[in-house]
C-alpha cells in the first residue's frame, strides 16, 4: 500500500488540491518538505491535534521532512470562530503559549528530525502599505466571501481583523514555498479555505512549472462520539499538557471508547499497521468483552504523548481501581486520580460516613450505612463493615491518600493535608 493510499485508508486525507500530484510527491523517490500550522492561542495542544501529529509521523517515515509552523503572528488575530469574535490575547500570553507548544512538539516528536518555524519572523516585517499593495491586491473579496466560515460569520458580524486572517495565513505557505522549498501543506478540514488561499497566492506570485506545483490537503477533524470536536474551545477539552489534563483521564477516555468508534481512532491516532488494526477489529468482534482494541488504543496514545513510564502508571492505576490491586498504586497514581476523581482534604481524621457523603459516593449518612452493611464499600481493596469507622492517616498510603470504592465503578479520594 502506497503512502497516499494509507493516508486515505486512515481517513487522514479528506480534501486534496491535486490527488495525482499528491501521490507523486508522497510516493516518489524525491524527498519533499511539508508543513502544518498551529496557532499559539492556548498553552497546550489538545487530543484533537494528534491527527496532525500522526500524519506528520507517517509522512516523515517515508523520508520526507516535516516543518511545524507556529503562529506567533497569526495568533495576534486568531482564526475566525464559527459563532463569535475571538478575544485578543496579550503578546506576553502568546509568547508563553508559543514556548509551551514548542516544548510539547520537541517532546512528542523527539525521535524524528523536524523544524519549528515562527511566522512572526516574516509577517512582522511587512508594513501595512506593502501588505495591501503586494498581497491585498491579489485577494478577491468575492473569493474570500465564498469561504464557509466567512459566509457564516457575516450573518453575525465579523471584524476586518479576523476577515484578514486568511490573507495572513496564506503568506505562510508562500514564504515557506519560496524560502524553504516547502511543497505541501496539510491541516484540519476547517483550514481548507486557508490552505487553498495559500495555493492561489503562490500561483499568482510565482511562475510555477507543473513539476514545482505545491499541494494542499486536509485531515478530517477528530470527533467525539457525540459529534463534537476535540477543540481548544470545546467543553471537556483534553489537553496534552499533564498539568491541565491528567494522563489518566485521557487513558480512561480512550479505554471507554465505543466499539463503533475504536477502529477509526486506531487509524487516525496511532501508528499501528493496517494488519494490526484489522486484527484488533476482528478480535473485538469475537471477544467484545475483552475490549482489546480499546486497551491498545489507550496504550498507544498515552505512550506517544507522555511516554512508556506514564502509560505504565496509568495502567497500574486502572488495575488498582477496577481490578483491586492496591500494590500497583504509586504516588503518581494518586496525582492522576486527584484530577480525575472527587476528593476531600482533611487534617487528621474523618468518619467513613462523612467521607462517603462529602466525596459524593452517596447523598446521606443513612444511605452510607446501608451501603456499608451491604458490603458495597471498600477502602482500597478491603471490604468495610464498620459503620462507626474513623479514618486517619494510618489507613492511608504514602501517609496521604485513602481510596474509597463503591461497587466496581465508583471511586473517590481522601487526601490528608
Curated annotation (Swiss-Prot):
UniProt motif 'KMSKS' region: location: 229-233
Which residues does the record give as L-tyrosine binding sites? 35, 165, 169
What biological process terms from GO does the record include?
tyrosyl-tRNA aminoacylation
Report the Pfam families cross-referenced here.
SYY_C-terminal, tRNA-synt_1b
State whether it acts alone or in a complex, and with which partners, per the record: Homodimer.
Homology family: Belongs to the class-I aminoacyl-tRNA synthetase family. TyrS type 1 subfamily.
Q: What is this protein called?
A: Tyrosine--tRNA ligase
What organism does this protein naturally occur in? Phytoplasma mali (strain AT)
Gene symbol here is tyrS
